[in-house]
Design a protein with these regions (language model features):
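Beta-strand-rich structural segments
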Residues: 44-57
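Bacterial Sec-dependent N-terminal signal peptides
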Residues: 1-44, 96-118, 360-363
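Local sequence-structure signature of Cys/Sec-based thiol-disulfide redox active-site neighborhoods
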Residues: 119-156, 160
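Short, conserved sequence motifs used for protein processing/export or organelle targeting and
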Residues: 160-363
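Proline-enriched interdomain boundary motifs that mark the N-terminal boundary
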Residues: 26-36, 128, 220-226
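Solvent-exposed segments in extracellular or luminal domains encompassing
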Residues: 77-86
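Append "Rare intracellular matches occur via the same short Y/T/C beta-strand/loop motifs
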Residues: 85-95
Length: 363
């Protein structure tokens, strides 16, 4: 059975807004529920455990947890499943309740463990920046931005500093179209949800600016490392991502699933696009990172230096809609954000294959 990627973190509030880094509006609530996992095996034994807090006080014992669709109470604070599907759980404590449920996905295969850590005591990680390109096949000025990116990436050292994701959210007729996140204007580029660039007429100058910005972002030590372990069955991809902290902090985790070799005729007002511009790489097919009003990732909570936290993500691979001929054209970017003022910025990212584990990348 196939599933949509509907894996929301604790007390998620879905708001009609398409920011990436966003701000912290709507993220805090007096009564909140959380879970120790978001994906379980549908064997009737694997269980997810829920907890509840009111203004920071543990009220789990006094909270009743329900399946939202049927308002059936759970047996205590645990949920098991003997059928494949997505289960939505809410909590009620006195007059307090959670408006948005926690989604738990039950799958008919074993949930993958985290990738093996080759150096458990090491916290010195390779640092890469997350470069998000907002373009579309119907955007006539977008080849200028793509040209700047290509020029910047001609330098192998610069290319290795970044993980690139192409967000085709401009026009619905785009074969790689995704409805969100969106940009305020197109073309647009963002690095780590912190530094942004809009269109100008000088791709070579823009390439120089991009190279400088990427170098500055990765010049500081990485606050976290990221590993991933994917498995797949019947076009359902399940990925467990683990985060290890190099610095104490509260972190969020997201995964954007990407596809290469997507063909789409590119509009070009600049007269610079040859046939290669009709083949699009790193196209975002699913941005599983929405929390509150942003796409800054699902909260992992506080992680102390040397400790880890994890989350599992599920993707329904739609070969027909995506015109996907080769599964090797799929990969994913796993990224971590941390709060910076009212915004959330990416503090590290890795590009992962769907066919093998990605261990922590140490310096």
């Amino acid at each position: 059975m196939k599933f949509a990627s509907l894996l929301l973190a604790s007390a998620v509030m879905l708001i009609s807004c398409d920011k990436t880094g966003g701000d912290d509006t709507g993220l805090d609530a007096g009564f909140q529920i959380s879970s120790n996992k978001n994906v379980i095996q549908s064997n009737g034994a694997d269980a997810v455990t829920f907890t509840a807090e009111l203004d920071g006080k543990d009220v789990t014992a006094e909270t009743t947890f329900y399946l939202k669709d049927s308002m059936t109470p759970l047996d205590g604070n645990k949920l098991t499943a003997d059928k494949v599907g997505v289960y939505h759980v809410i909590g009620m404590y006195g007059t307090f309740y959670t408006e948005e449920p926690i989604a738990v996905t039950a799958i008919d295969m074993e949930v993958p463990a985290p990738a093996e850590d080759p150096a458990a005591s090491n916290t010195s990680f390779v640092h890469r920046a997350f470069l998000n390109q907002y373009t579309g096949t119907g955007c006539g000025y977008c080849p200028g931005m793509v040209s700047a990116l290509r020029a910047a990436f001609e330098d192998e050292e610069t290319k290795n500093m970044a993980v690139h994701a192409a967000v085709h959210s401009y026009n619905a007729g785009d074969p790689a179209y995704i409805g969100a996140p969106k940009a305020s204007g197109y073309p647009y580029m963002e690095i780590d949800m912190a530094v942004s660039f809009s269109y100008d007429l000088d791709p070579d100058a823009k390439a120089g600016v991009l190279k400088k910005a990427l170098s500055e972002r990765v010049s500081v030590p990485a606050k976290v490392g990221i590993s991933a372990n994917p498995i797949s069955k019947d076009d359902v991809l399940v990925v467990t991502v683990e985060v290890k902290a190099a610095e104490d902090g509260e972190y969020n985790l997201g995964v954007w699933f990407l596809q290469d070799n997507v063909y789409g005729q590119q509009t070009d007002y600049l007269g610079i696009a040859d046939n290669s511009y009709n083949y699009h790489e790193n196209c975002v097919r699913s941005a599983d990172s929405r929390f509150g009003s942003s796409f800054a990732g699902h909260p992992l909570g506080q992680i102390k230096k040397g400790e880890t936290a994890q989350r599992t993500f599920v993707l329904n691979i739609d070969r027909e809609a995506w015109k996907l001929k080769d599964l090797n054209d799929l990969h994913f970017a796993a990224f971590v954000t941390a709060k910076n003022g009212r915004n959330y910025n990416v503090v590290n990212v890795v590009d992962c294959k769907i066919s093998e584990p990605t261990p922590y990348q140490y310096k």
